[in-house]
Amino acid sequence: MESRIKVLVVDDSAFMRKVITSMLESDPRLEVVGTARNGEDALKKRKTLAPDVMTLDVEMPVMDGIETLKRLMSENPLPIIIVSSTTKEGAENALTAMELGAVDFITKPSGPISLDLEKVRDLLIEKVASAPNVKLKPTSKKAPVVFRPLQQPVPFDKTIIVIGTSTGGPKALKQVLTKLPKDLPAPILIVQHMPAGFTESLANRLNSLCEIHVKEAEDGEIIRPGVAYIAPGGYHLETKRLGTSIALHLTKEEPRKGHRPSVDVLFESVSALSSIYKVAVIMTGMGSDGTEGLEQLKRGSCYAIAESEQSCVVFGMPKVAIERKLVDEVTHLELIADSIVRQCKR
């Protein structure tokens, strides 16, 4: 019998420690070896209990989750799942934590008697059970990739870029989008698996770092070149023709493969736009979201890029697309922006 995955639960709320422990122990693959009420307590228990995975609250007394995460990742990294509140501050903290090396996050259940609890439980179990397989990488010491800016923009009506990603996506998106020039002659539509309330913070953070404009997508807006639109958490992102323009459409249709927004839904919608060249990018993430949509995109004029196993945090979504032979190029995360730019110049 396989040994169980050992988990340390860190939260300043006794009630939340109990709820999370109960959720995790409902799965036979997981064993909660201990709990801690703050960061200092967590650092001590990490040494004595040797957990495989840690769930970590952010807002705690004595030592908060961000400081705890910094210490853990600099001394002896382990996979950490952030347990975040759904407030704007909680969203910002979760994004900061992922930049510092946390592998993923979930939002706290909203109450003890709630349908929300069951959803959170299934998500928490999935993320914790897969966390030991996630690659933990130190910050790259390699020389930055030299970026060659576009010399001659091409009209927008020729190209549209679509990106799908999940676990590890916020850091991957930062790597790609910060290397794109402000005069990029194509719009970018992005699905990042995230709950409602978090995608706006992600868009704002990326916008402050990028030459292109990055924003959360809004229903009915006309897409423009040089702008990246991130699907809001809880909504599918689709496109529709409006005369010679293309507008965004947000829907609350059922989740696909458990996801809303879904990469498949975006890719399938964009595949229906005739006479437009599509550049599709699938990056780090669990599961196979995006593969069905990519099959439809490839029936038309589409160049598909998959992130290589070498740079993926989780080599799931790209792996499936590669195995189905739907991909034209497999490349390291640091080179994806360069590939996108080359396709815009074709």
UniProtKB/Swiss-Prot annotation:
Disulphide bridges, residue numbers: none
EC number of the protein: 3.1.1.61, 3.5.1.44
PTM (free text): Phosphorylated by CheA. Phosphorylation of the N-terminal regulatory domain activates the methylesterase activity.
Residue ranges annotated for the CheB-type methylesterase domain, each copy included: 155-346
GO CC annotation: cytoplasm
Record-annotated Response regulatory domain positions: 6-123
Modified residues (4-aspartylphosphate): D57
Location in or out of the cell: Cytoplasm
Signal peptide range: none
Catalysed reaction, written as an equation: [protein]-L-glutamate 5-O-methyl ester + H2O = L-glutamyl-[protein] + methanol + H(+); L-glutaminyl-[protein] + H2O = L-glutamyl-[protein] + NH4(+)
Catalytic residues identified in the record: S166, H193, D289
PROSITE patterns tied to this protein: CHEB (PS50122), RESPONSE_REGULATORY (PS50110)
Keywords: Chemotaxis, Cytoplasm, Hydrolase, Phosphoprotein
Functional summary from the UniProt entry: Involved in chemotaxis. Part of a chemotaxis signal transduction system that modulates chemotaxis in response to various stimuli. Catalyzes the demethylation of specific methylglutamate residues introduced into the chemoreceptors (methyl-accepting chemotaxis proteins or MCP) by CheR. Also mediates the irreversible deamidation of specific glutamine residues to glutamic acid.
Family designation: Belongs to the CheB family.
NCBIfam families: PRK00742.1, PRK12555.1
Name of this chain's protein: Protein-glutamate methylesterase/protein-glutamine glutaminase
Annotated gene: cheB
